[in-house]
């Protein structure tokens, strides 16, 4: 297979690429990674896709179907499950790019949407976690204020605002990427109405962070020059938008680290409040409320820690990716990012597993939903206060619920 890196039809002749030669593209594969890396990564990602989609669908169905589960905290978690589902929908496109960075066959719209939806849902998840942590802080450290501020209607409105802010913040990504033809391949009109492939000298020195895939090889066989040029089309940032893309990637990084700082402060204050309140409580209602608070914080802390562990490498990899020009660091960045990609999709798949492991109420509701039992699982009784809210969950203590030690139940 020919390659613009070693072609001799350019006006300046062939020049060596700025990093070691990569295997050429063919009809089956166009990737800088060997099969020994692609196969296990693909297997892991497909497992995450199946587990994540099924788990998040169950979470959304539980919160939508059972009124006991429709609480302020669980409304956030249900919205986060929708965000995770949308993130997981981008996994097949990332797998396609791992195996075949070019040609991109899904059109410019899906090229733009695959990045935009992933970024927008990432922002939405971060904003949801921050808002949920603020609610928990108010419920535990400022309970009187929480009784006034936190209601289901306001939480639903806030969730809509969070989604709007997230999607608007990610809006520039719609214009920063597109289906680009490799600069090293162009169709040049020839004599007698013929056409030929021309190799541009610009192909020898593209920005290293723009495209890590191997140089394209035109399809073998009697394809035309136009078909060979089409083979080089790739979903990637536009060269004219590289500066703006760098800015947006730093915005994305700030979107991660600023909420992380906020979460650290909030959970530090919550932990101090819960620790200082570890004293004998009067009556079963106070004892049940305290256990509900602790269970809620325990679940949310596990979710937040899993989120940080899974997403931190992703953002560190991006920082390395957009700042390195050294070929050895480039190879390190490639393999670091392929691991970070798996952790990124793990974060979108793991929350339902955590809910199932930690929350008895979630397990009971999921068991009832999946087996379609007619009888209500144990503990699924309701009590209402004057506002008509359902008591007994992680969010119930924020709106003036009447709780007892028997009906304090948590989902997460």
From Swiss-Prot:
SUPFAM superfamilies documented for this protein: Family A G protein-coupled receptor-like
Glycosites: 6, 192
Disulfide bonds: 111-235
Tissue expression as described in the entry: Expressed only in thyroid, stomach, and bone marrow.
Keyword Transmembrane helix: yes
Transmembrane feature ranges: 36-56, 75-94, 113-134, 158-178, 247-270, 299-320, 335-358
GO molecular-function term, one example from the UniProt record: hormone binding
Keyword annotations of the record: Cell membrane, Disulfide bond, G-protein coupled receptor, Glycoprotein, Membrane, Receptor, Transducer, Transmembrane, Transmembrane helix
Cell membrane found in the keyword field: yes
Biological process annotations from GO: G protein-coupled receptor signaling pathway
Membrane topology: Multi-pass membrane protein
Side of membrane Cytoplasmic, spans: 57-74, 135-157, 271-298, 359-412
Subcellular location, record wording: Cell membrane
Family matches, as Pfam families: 7tm_1
GO cellular component, one term: plasma membrane
Membership in a protein family: Belongs to the G-protein coupled receptor 1 family.
Known role: Receptor for motilin.
Protein name, UniProt field: Motilin receptor
Organism whose genome encodes this protein: Homo sapiens (Human)
Lineage: Eukaryota, Metazoa, Chordata, Craniata, Vertebrata
Annotated gene: MLNR
């Amino acid at each position: 297979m020919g390659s613009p890196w070693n072609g001799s039809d350019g006006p300046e002749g062939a020049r060596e690429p700025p990093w070691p030669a990569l295997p050429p593209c063919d009809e089956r594969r166009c990737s800088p990674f060997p099969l020994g890396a692609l196969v296990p990564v693909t297997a892991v990602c497909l497992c995450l896709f199946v587990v994540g989609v099924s788990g998040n669908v169950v979470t959304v169905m539980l919160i939508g179907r059972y009124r006991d589960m429709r609480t302020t905290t669980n409304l956030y978690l249900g919205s986060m499950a929708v965000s995770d589902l949308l993130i997981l929908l981008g996994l097949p496109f990332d797998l396609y790019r791992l195996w075949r960075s070019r040609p991109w066959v899904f059109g410019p719209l899906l090229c733009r949407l695959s990045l935009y939806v992933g970024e927008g849902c990432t922002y939405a998840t971060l904003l949801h976690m921050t808002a949920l942590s603020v609610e928990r802080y108010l419920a535990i450290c400022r309970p009187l204020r929480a009784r006034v501020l936190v209601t289901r209607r306001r939480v639903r409105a806030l969730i809509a605002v969070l989604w709007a802010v997230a999607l608007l913040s990610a809006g520039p990504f719609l214009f920063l990427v597109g289906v680009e033809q490799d600069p090293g391949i162009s169709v040049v009109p020839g004599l007698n109405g013929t056409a030929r492939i021309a190799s541009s000298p610009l192909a020898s020195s593209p920005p290293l962070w723009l495209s890590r895939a191997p140089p394209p090889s035109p399809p073998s066989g009697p394809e035309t020059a136009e078909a060979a040029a089409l083979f080089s089309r790739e979903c990637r940032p536009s060269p004219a938008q590289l500066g703006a893309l760098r800015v947006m990637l730093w915005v994305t990084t700030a979107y991660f680290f600023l909420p992380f700082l906020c979460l650290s402060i909030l959970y530090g204050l919550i932990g101090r409040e819960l620790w200082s309140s570890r004293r004998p409580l009067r009556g079963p209602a106070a004892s049940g409320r305290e256990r509900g608070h602790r269970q809620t914080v325990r679940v949310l802390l596990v979710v937040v820690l899993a989120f940080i562990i899974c997403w931190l490498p992703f953002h560190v990899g991006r920082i390395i990716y957009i700042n390195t020009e050294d070929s050895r660091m480039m190879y390190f960045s490639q393999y670091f990012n392929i691991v970070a990609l798996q952790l990124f999709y793990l974060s979108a798949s793991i929350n339902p597993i955590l809910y199932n492991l930690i929350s008895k109420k979630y397990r009971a509701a999921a068991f009832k939903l999946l087996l379609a039992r007619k009888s209500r699982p144990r503990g699924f009784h309701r009590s209402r206060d004057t506002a008509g809210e359902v008591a007994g969950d992680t969010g119930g203590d924020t709106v003036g619920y009447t709780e007892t030690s028997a009906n304090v139940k948590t989902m997460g």
